[in-house]
Structure formats: C-alpha cells, structure tokens
Amino acid sequence: MSDSEEESQDRQLKIVVLGDGASGKTSLATCFAQETFGKRYKQTIGLDFFLRRITLPGNLNVTLQIWDIGGQTIGGKMLDKYIYGAQGVLLVYDITNYQSFENLEDWYTVVKKVSEESETRPLVALVGNKIDLEHMRTIKPEKHLRFCQENGFSSHFVSAKTGDSVFLCFQKVAAEILGIKLNKAEIEQSQRVVKADIVNYNQEPMSRTVNPPRSSMCAVQ
C-alpha cells in the first residue's frame, strides 16, 4: 500500500474550544490529549494547541487538532481567524458559574458570524464542565438542554478533574462530524475516570503552557 493510500484512511479535524476563562477549557483539552489534570490554574493567553489521534468504528484513524482559545480573546481581532475552518466547536462553561453560561451567547454569536462569512457550519457542542461539583451547580440541566434544543447543539456534561465523560465528549463530536454512529458498548468503554488532587485556583494570571505541572496526578481506571 502506498503512503498516499495510507494517508487516505486518516482524517484530521479542527476542534475549537471556546468559553470564559476558568471554565476549564485548558483542563478539558489537557485531560483529553494527555490524560492529565493540572493542579494550578494557568490562564491561556491567545491560544494553545493539543493533538490526539483516536480510532473510530471501521478502524478510521482521526487526529483531533484542539484549539484552546483564551477566555480574554472574546473581544479580540483574531478570534474569527481562530474559529475559521473548524469542523467542530465546543462551547464550554462551568456548571457552578452562572455568568460563564450566560456569556456563551457572545461566543456563539462570533461562531455564527464566521459560519455565515465562510458559508460552512461547524458542529457545535454545549459542554457543561465540573460535574464533580454537582452540589455547587448554578445552571439547571433543563436550562442547558433548552439552549441545545434552541440552537441545534449536541449536549455533554463532563469533569476535566475526574475525567468523567471527557474522552466520550470528543469521541462523540468527532463521530458526529464524520457521520459515524457509536454503539452502546463503545460509549460505555469511553467513559473514563481520572483520579486527581484537589485544585486550589490561583487568581493571578500566569503565562500559558501546554505542559502539565510536574506535581499533577492522573490515573486512568
């Protein structure tokens, strides 16, 4: 088999992760791409990139190129350029932070603007993060689901800290983009649990990095 024939069996998808700062976007991307969870909050300045190759049913290899967009980018001139060409968009909010959910309207407005200008519509997924803090939830699941129904989003609830449904979220998004259906066994196999230490968020902005702190801990069960 030639190199070109081998490459034809691989797909690459651009997935853009949007949402307010401290909603857990970087932790989500890191948990998926590196199966780790950083113990300290590091503000993303501009954007970070993550890559992970997964295999979907039919032995289809898919490389997900994750664009983690900084929360302060919402008013910047580069945001539309970051979104351009994306096959998938994750709108991420913190289920314990009501404002992070409300602000998704602004993020989605930019996505719609870029989609209209490029005449392409990416798959958009609404992702409620930090479900390990269910007792502190401020956004009811019904409100989350209503927002999905009104805009045609796919719906996901995850915890970047425990790893709950993180891989499944990205797997489902990739499969939906490519028109592939996952069966029940594949979905159950993808629901991973990651052990992590308690996080103390540092409110001081820090320079961005794609490498997890050395003291981070993560174990996939």
Curated annotation (Swiss-Prot):
Highest taxon of the lineage: Eukaryota
Localization per record: Cell membrane; Cytoplasm, Cytoskeleton, Cilium basal body; Cytoplasm; Nucleus
Modified residues (Phosphoserine): 8
Keywords: Acetylation, Cell membrane, Cell projection, Cytoplasm, Cytoskeleton, GTP-binding, Hydrolase, Lipoprotein, Magnesium, Membrane, Metal-binding, Methylation, Nucleotide-binding, Nucleus, Phosphoprotein, Prenylation
Propeptide span(s): 219-221
Regulation of its function: Regulated by guanine nucleotide exchange factors (GEFs) which promote the exchange of bound GDP for free GTP. Regulated by GTPase activating proteins (GAPs) which increase the GTP hydrolysis activity. Inhibited by GDP dissociation inhibitors (GDIs).
Cofactor(s) this protein cannot do without: Mg(2+)
Example of a GO MF term: GTP binding
Statement: the UniProt record of this protein carries the keyword Cell division: no
Modification type Cysteine methyl ester: residues: 218
Region Switch I, residue ranges: 35-49
Domain observations: Switch I, switch II and the interswitch regions are characteristic of Rab GTPases and mediate the interactions with Rab downstream effectors. The switch regions undergo conformational changes upon nucleotide binding which drive interaction with specific sets of effector proteins, with most effectors only binding to GTP-bound Rab.
Similarity comment text for this entry: Belongs to the small GTPase superfamily. Rab family.
Free-text function comment from the UniProt entry: The small GTPases Rab are key regulators of intracellular membrane trafficking, from the formation of transport vesicles to their fusion with membranes. Rabs cycle between an inactive GDP-bound form and an active GTP-bound form that is able to recruit to membranes different sets of downstream effectors directly responsible for vesicle formation, movement, tethering and fusion. RAB28 is required for shedding and phagocytosis of cone cell outer segments (OS) discs in the retina. Also participates in nuclear factor kappa-B p65/RELA nuclear transport in endothelial cells.
The protein's name in its UniProt record: Ras-related protein Rab-28
Native source species: Pongo abelii (Sumatran orangutan)
Lineage: Eukaryota, Metazoa, Chordata, Craniata, Vertebrata
